[in-house]
Amino acid sequence: MNADNPGPAATTVAAIAPALKAEILAEALPYIRKFHGKTIVVKYGGNAMTEEKLKHGFARDVILLKLVGMNPVVVHGGGPQIDEALKKVGKVGTFVQGMRVTDEETMEVVEWVLGGEVQQDIVMLINQYGGQAVGLTGKDGGLIRAKRLQMPDRENPGAFIDIGYVGDIEAINPAVVKALQDDAFIPVISPIGFSDDGQAYNINADVVAGKMAEILKAEKLVMMTNIPGVMDKKGNLLTDLSAREIEELFADGTISGGMLPKISSALDAAKSGVHSVHIIDGRIEHSLLLEILTEQAFGTMIRSH
């Protein structure tokens, strides 16, 4: 229950019985201690970015994590916003293996939407609720160095598909992120990388989040989606997946489309030492807090073994 979604009875924080308040705090306390001083990377996307109630709730949740001593780092997507902007200029987005085909005009739109409109909206909301957020792209402090992605052609082994200005991460320089964390700021990162000659590249936000979690030695990577987690072919939630099970789901086509880079990045992060990797339903209010601060099993956990 929360103040944003009142039922027939009063459900404001003030109306919650003292015993229940104490129970909520008691459940959260071990997790606050466990993650105090730790970096939590959050991939923020989907409905949580487009529905007003969820947007405001996310901003407050991130601030709370910071206030209790954690170091949240937000990596955001913006697919629906990019699609809408492309529609206005008469273009339709196309995808290959979950990656957006990005010609020169599309790249200009991506830069404007992600590095401008979407990022500024997130930063503004966090600051509006009393947090201190700073927006970054890959150019800031040399954060994300990228090169053109070579997309393997699955039907022609050894061949590659040209999908334009889509980036492959060459290196991440975490200095600017760590400096912001040390000064109590919340970094909000747009998934745009840059080559040494200044060419901008559109990078899948899941890929950036996974690599950022690895480089920052994050305790936890949480990916917010528009589904409950990873689903089997019958629509059942898979709550726990090992590397072997993920490979089987890739092979039989259960994981496809936009889930391919998401699950690949989650698995890579787990293999690289990120202690906890979860894919959760961002359509649920305060799902981020439920995942981090409660015992409730939520979404899909990705394991490296």
UniProtKB/Swiss-Prot annotation:
Which GO BP terms, alphabetically?
arginine biosynthetic process via ornithine; L-arginine biosynthetic process
Is this entry keyworded Cytoplasm?
yes
The pathway that the record names for this protein is: Amino-acid biosynthesis; L-arginine biosynthesis; N(2)-acetyl-L-ornithine from L-glutamate: step 2/4
Q: Name one GO molecular function term.
A: ATP binding
Question: Top EC class per UniProt?
Answer: transferase
What positions does the entry give for substrate binding?
78-79, 100, 202
Example of a GO cellular component annotation carried by this entry: cytoplasm
Q: What is the protein name stated in its UniProt record?
A: Acetylglutamate kinase
Organism of origin: Cupriavidus necator (strain ATCC 17699 / DSM 428 / KCTC 22496 / NCIMB 10442 / H16 / Stanier 337)
Source species taxonomy: Bacteria, Pseudomonadati, Pseudomonadota, Betaproteobacteria, Burkholderiales
Q: Which gene encodes it?
A: argB
